[in-house]
Amino acid sequence: MTLIKSISGIRGTIGGQPGDTLNPLDIVKFTTAYATYIRRNTTNGSNKIVVGRDARISGQMVCNIVCGTLMGMGYDVVNIGLATTPTTELAVNMSNADGGIIITASHNPRQWNALKLLNNKGEFLNKAAGNEVLAIADSEDFDYADVDHVGKYTEDNSFDQKHIDSVLALQLVDVEAIKNAHFKVAVDSINSVGGVILPKLLDKLGVEYTFLNGEANGNFAHNPEPLAKNLTGIMDLIAKGGYDMGIVVDPDVDRLAFICEDGKMFGEEYTLVSVADYVLSHTPGNTVSNLSSTRALRDVTEKHGGAYSAAAVGGGNVTTKIK
């Protein structure tokens, strides 16, 4: 049994004793601490927090507790349901919300879940903000809303389409070229939210597809980290022929891996470098990545006349470095 506290939120295994795992009492405690931090530091005025989750078995339970706690803190909750991490980040920004909570343990196994905390721009909290949330949780300096100020609850399932529309509107995305290529792909969405949004995106792009583990039921068919040792199913399928490529995502779709037409991994590091090369060739500029990324990112950035900077591991640290 494990509970890990960090600047980006808390994660742990479900069940067990308070203080040692991700259990209902600690979910309430850290959600309350986050809401307290937002109340003290955000001036959007919307009094609204977005909540999204991946398809983990524990997700509905955790979501119910998070939403109820936020309402108890006087916040109106917009529950966008099963949603990718990038979709939830986008929803915070599009809704002019005060913040957001993503309920996902990313590539960790099914017994794990987590609360990932966002600011009012849909960005992960930086180090200072994350430490303030942890300090508030430790002090338990909480003040819940009275009966006349309890928050409202709404559900909004429109953000998958809004996310897809925003991607297709990017100048760097040549929709017609993709349609004219008549691609056929295999997709492993590991029984989570990739199986909800990716068919909608691929349909818009005119891509023919076969899904493996496409049902978003949280019963992960294999270890959800998108590494070659976990992806023999889709790699073997593509190696038999008939597909242009394979697409693999993790449970909250913030990690992406490609499989080549011969069934071999293209690799996450190569994907990042290839995308950076394409983007910088059209829109030159500087780049930032975390210290665990490949050195090739520096090389491709400098090739296009830009400057590369490295940040500590963590989405909030990368965002801070960009700014």
Predicted segments with their positions:
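N-terminal small/polar loop signature for handling phosphorylated ligands or for N-terminal nucleophile
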Residues: T36, R40, K48-W112, K200-I259
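Proline/glycine-rich low-complexity loops and linkers
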Residues: L134-D165, C260-K323
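Solvent-exposed alpha-helices and their adjacent loops that cap or buttress functional pockets
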Residues: L3, T42-N44, V92-S95, N108-R110, ...
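A structured phosphate/pyrophosphate-recognition subdomain
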Residues: L3-I4, G12, K179-D203, S292-K323
